[in-house]
Amino acid sequence: MKNINSEIRQQIRNAVINSINKSVETGELPSLEVTDITIEIPREKGHGDFSTNVAMQITKAAKKAPRQIADIIIKNIVTDGTYIDKVTCAGPGFINFTLDNSYLYETVNIIQQEKENYGRINIGNGKKVMVEFVSANPTGPLHMGNARGGALGDCIASVLDAAGYNVTREFLINDAGNQIEKFGTSLEARYIQLIKGEDAIEFPEDGYQGEDITEHMKDFIAIHGDKYINTDSEERKKVFVDFALPRNIARIKEGLESYGIHFDIWFSEQSLHKSGEVAETIQLLKDRGCTVEKEGALWLKGSVIGSEKDEVLVRNNGIPTYFAADIAYHRNKFEKRGFEWVINLWGADHHGHVARMKAAMAALGINPDKLDVVLFQLVRLYRNGEIARMSKRTGKSISLMDLVEEVGRDGVRYFFNTKASGSHLDFDLDLAVKQSNENPVFYVQYAHARICSMFKLLESEGIKVPSANAIKAELLDKPEELELIRKLSEYPDEVRISAETLEPSRLTRYVHDVASTFHSFYNACRVRGEEEELMQARLVLVDCTRIVVKNVLDLLSITAPERM
């Protein structure tokens, strides 16, 4: 796909570097080497279309003031054969580039030709990437942390796919360890209580109290009765877990499906133990001199993971810790399955685990830079201006399913991606269901619906959207028209930056800006009732807006309604 903004950035980059080299040759600048420069879109509209701070970057090496360097670069710059119309200096030494409108008119052509592929780029070159997210505890329902992590992870995966990576979405099923032991103990206690009465056994103080535990055991009893009342406890707990856990996982899958999330792989933690990969990984760490035995347990040396204290890998009862299994799991991702880049989404409370896991990878001979962890902050739900803790429907803690039912999938996914992952998120439930421009998802969807309604009306009058090749694009010269095209031209860059930063919140901000810019255009520039050639040109521009809004919403897995 053609990325005209990328082409322009390269033109600017080449022109600036060539100018610096020429300035060195003429003696206006001392000998220095510049191989790349930062190019950004200025915040101030009057400062051109693109800008670079290269003069400030090389001021020390050039032994001149940034403004003086900028003037020299501008004096020697050659822009023939580029989209650059004007080069100026601003502030302490920013070099600003104003482009001629031909690039905007070419953008209109590109958008209409590429349609749903507009914005897709190829910075990934098919690199094999795994995004592991949600990975909720399978002993209970999906909570708000899972909901936010799900929206973030799914959008990150979609953005990387649009950027040319070969993406796999994975859910780790934590079906081993302490939480499964606690799950089995909770099921066993409830089973005995249902058969013999509540006084027959005390429910574990730290057990799972959810109604699903009771529901599982009632359904189990309906099938098997009291058959297991005298069975050995360990055997009985295994039977109960084998019955209840798949039901919980099925509910998690159902909840995520309703949320628009589809995983390629559901990976069992238990499989790592059964295959011997956990033991194999522990042995590898031992062979590399990374472990120490003490107090009857096996520890990973703190010096290996940059910690003041050692970490237990195998307890004194011979059972590996979750940390050991997690190291084996990450080794499996890289070495067994060949992923070149692994991205995990974890709650911010896991921040201390990031450095340890990266260090563990390094200890295994795996490049830790191939592992990235996106940490996301907590969510607070608000209703009527107060923190909402209970579901309207159930009167219990709000689960993901409750949230989707109350707000709708589109609203939930959009709102969870409005803030950077590292920021706390206040989710206004009342705002998310408002049918007004105050609601950002409604505002964006309305822009798409408004365009579709316009086209339907025009089609009933025999007017169709022409091909961009058939219009006089130069008629689009009003500030509102040019600003809208300029905004549409930024989409491939937004995909690129979102992929590089793993921040899909850029896309919700961007599509809201597109909708806002479109509404400004629509209020300032008539489409129907204008002279024929101008109407045709504006129809193409409106169609390009529809394409971009839909493409962004598709990337966010949010519907683009044709009427509202």
Swiss-Prot record:
Q: Where is this motif: 'HIGH' region?
A: 136-146
Q: Where in the cell is it found?
A: Cytoplasm
Q: Where is it predominantly found?
A: cytoplasm
- Which key words are in the record? Aminoacyl-tRNA synthetase, ATP-binding, Cytoplasm, Ligase, Nucleotide-binding, Protein biosynthesis
Query: Which GO MF terms does the UniProt record name?
Result: arginine-tRNA ligase activity; ATP binding
Q: Which InterPro entries match?
A: aa-tRNA-synth_I_CS (IPR001412), Arg-tRNA-ligase (IPR001278), Arg-tRNA-synth_N (IPR005148), Arg-tRNA-synth_N_sf (IPR036695), ArgRS_core (IPR035684), DALR_anticod-bd (IPR008909), Rossmann-like_a/b/a_fold (IPR014729), tRNAsynth_Ia_anticodon-bd (IPR009080)
Q: Which CDD domains match?
A: Anticodon_Ia_Arg, ArgRS_core
What does UniProt give as GO cellular component? cytoplasm
Q: Which EC number applies?
A: 6.1.1.19
Reactions catalysed: tRNA(Arg) + L-arginine + ATP = L-arginyl-tRNA(Arg) + AMP + diphosphate
User: How does it associate, per the subunit comment?
Assistant: Monomer.
Question: Which HAMAP family does this entry report, sorted A to Z?
Answer: Arg_tRNA_synth
Q: What protein name does the entry list?
A: Arginine--tRNA ligase
Lineage, broadest ranks: Bacteria, Bacillati, Bacillota, Clostridia, Eubacteriales
This protein's encoding gene: argS
